[in-house]
Amino acid sequence: MEGVGAVRFWLVVCGCLAFPPRAESVCPERCDCQHPQHLLCTNRGLRAVPKTSSLPSPQDVLTYSLGGNFITNITAFDFHRLGQLRRLDLQYNQIRSLHPKTFEKLSRLEELYLGNNLLQALAPGTLAPLRKLRILYANGNEIGRLSRGSFEGLESLVKLRLDGNVLGALPDAVFAPLGNLLYLHLEANRIRFLGKNAFTQLGKLRFLNLSANELQPSLRHAATFVPLRSLSTLILSANSLQHLGPRVFQHLPRLGLLSLSGNQLTHLAPEAFWGLEALRELRLEGNRLNQLPLTLLEPLHSLEALDLSGNELSALHPATFGHQGRLRELSLRDNALSALSGDIFAASPALYRLDLDGNGWTCDCRLRGLKRWMGNWHSQGRLLTVFVQCRHPPALRGKYLDYLDDQLLQNGSCVDPSPSPTAGSRQWPISTAPGEGMTPPAGLAQELPLQPQPQPQQRGRLLPGVAWAGAAKELVGNRSALRLNRRGPGLQHQSPSAAAASGSAPQSLDLHEKPERGRPTRANLPQTEPTPTSEPASGTPSARDSWQRAAKQRLASEQQGRAVQYDSGVGLPPLVSDPCDFNKFILCNLTVEAVSANSASVRWAVREHRSPRPQGGARFRLLFDRFGQQPKFQRFVYLPERSDSATLHELRGDTPYLVCVEGVLGGRVCPVAPRDHCAGLVTLPEAGGRGGVDYQLLTLVLLAINALLVLLALAAWGSRWLRRKLRARRKGGAPVHVRHMYSTRRPLRSMGTGVSADFSGFQSHRPRTTVCALSEADLIEFPCDRFMDSSGGGTGGSLRREDHLLQRFAD
């Protein structure tokens, strides 16, 4: 045995010598070398670059991370053995200097990160060996000067970060070696002056960030940006710019984003943005602009986003955005605007995001055009919610323009500056012959002012081909709406022969309709405002005076009766012009009347009300869709005026539907969903056709099948458990008579009786058989067959036991 053990020992020794263990790589202290190509030493508290001499193959390392340590100096031999290195990270250290030969062996390096250190300069020639370098981060240092030799040899550089330094100027041709540079970050420095040749040889540059510097107040020299023909993003925000000269960006034909935010601009030359035909986004927020030249934005045909927030704009010309057909986003928030023309955004059909919040809006008749435009754009789903919160007058302070009625915007002292064409308001020249003395009556001097001498209150507009016949009967309260019959061209106060005889040149007369919506009171009813009739004037002052007196008397008597009626509020239904108020107070009782397999009829009620004349009567929009469908209400239909019922066709049988109705006033709908006017219905099953799937029956069948499967599984598990229980009892349990024999619950007497009865034939002089071998300590000899399994059962087993007993106890 000892010889065999010795042989085994020598065999093991020989095997170990023949197959030595594989040598493991030795990683530098405090570093991680789990991946053979990545050497990770980030945030390890290192104060010097670890030695890589212990690495078995340093040439395999491609990434070396040393960021977040306390390294202060880089020697010439720290990376001497890492010739295949592609990425070197030295950020967030305390490096103050770089040895001129630090990167001499790193000719394959592509990414170098030196950001957030204490470097004060990039010595000429230090980076020259890095011919394949594409990304260089030198941000967050203390670099105060640059020279052309700082970037010598970096022909492949694509991205350069120099932000967060203390650069005061850019020397001429400092970036000339970087012919392939695409991204240049110079923000957060102290640059005050841009040299004429600062960006020479940067013809491929796409991104230039000069924000947060100290540029001179005036940017006037266009030659600075001449080399940047491919520039698409220019950021000049957070400087001290105050003026922009004309055509300063004319050499940037591909510029798509220009940011001038956060400066102190107070003046922009009308041609400041000339040549920027490709500009898509212009940011001018946070300046001190109080006006915009009319032709400032004219060259920007491709403009899509314009931010003018945070300035001091108090007014905008209606044609300011007349050339921005692609404008999609416009911000005018936090300015000093009090009114805007309704036509100012008419040339921008793509506008969908408009921010007008934070201005001092004066909600009067000057905002009616803007309100109509907003309503039309909202109803067409082409504009997001615009918040125009009133600041003046005090009675409307804090309210939003789109929820105000036109009656609240009426001001007796304001003139509608430029009616919006979207509302159908056009100015029509009306010819008259002043030679015949046919001027408007004295009582209507305020209602019908001549165009050369506009009066403060212009209160009516006449359509072409309108005669004055019957106008006095249609003048209603202070609304001053002249319902005139269209009979001929112009105001026919005289016969054609008289007009021909006069021979005087006609004058143009502009009338502006200023309807006041709401219930008039006695205070605002005009008391002395005559109405012209169809009777021809005689042309003499006496005839004209008598005509005026008669008209005044008739009008005064009619208005006195109307004033009593208006004050008592009898017989005048409410005037509703807002679709939300119409849905809330006028529309009611939406019910489903008849339902079939493919159609359904709904009916609703409309309370008595009045609608503004320019808007016409109320129309209705019926929305319906299957219940639970997402998105909701993909189908809807517009109904004509005075409709109170509708029938939906082409519905699906045995399907639940949700039907809603809402009012449409002046082409506008309420932006709030009509939840109060909705009803549900379930169409009937299709008769005579192949019925669809009965989902209720299908559900019950599936539930029954699932319950049956559960019961079968429980039954199988129960039977298996019971079978295991019985099998365990058979294997581990003793015969029943043995358990009863040794039971402690049986009395001692009965147990002794049983023993004496069973072994009554015992004879001590007989020899023990080999069948039951007992030890010398046994006091009683038990028959072994009593411990045998009695499960053999049957008559044969009992007979064999009895025969054995007879043979043993024969004597």
From Swiss-Prot:
Ranges in the topological domain labelled Cytoplasmic: 718-809
Membrane topology, from the record: Single-pass type I membrane protein
Polar residues bias: start-end ranges: 421-430, 524-545
Gene3D superfamilies: Ribonuclease Inhibitor
GO cellular component: extracellular matrix; extracellular space; lipopolysaccharide receptor complex
Domain LRRCT, chain residue ranges per copy: 359-416
Keywords, sorted A to Z: Glycoprotein, Immunity, Inflammatory response, Innate immunity, Leucine-rich repeat, Membrane, Phosphoprotein, Repeat, Signal, Transmembrane, Transmembrane helix
Protein name: TLR4 interactor with leucine rich repeats
Signal peptide positions (record): 1-25
Extent of Low complexity compositional bias: 440-460, 494-508
Location of this chain's protein in the cell: Membrane
Region called Disordered, residue ranges: 414-460, 486-562
Entry's transmembrane regions: 697-717
Subunit field text: Belongs to the lipopolysaccharide (LPS) receptor, a multi-protein complex containing at least CD14, MD-2 and TLR4. Interacts with TLR4; this interaction is greatly enhanced following LPS stimulation. Interacts with LPS.
Highest rank taxon of the organism: Eukaryota
MF annotations from Gene Ontology: lipopolysaccharide binding
UniProt cross-references to SUPFAM superfamilies, sorted A to Z: Fibronectin type III, L domain-like
Post-translational modification (record): N-glycolysaled.
GO BP, one annotated term: regulation of cytokine production involved in immune response
Encoding gene per record: Tril
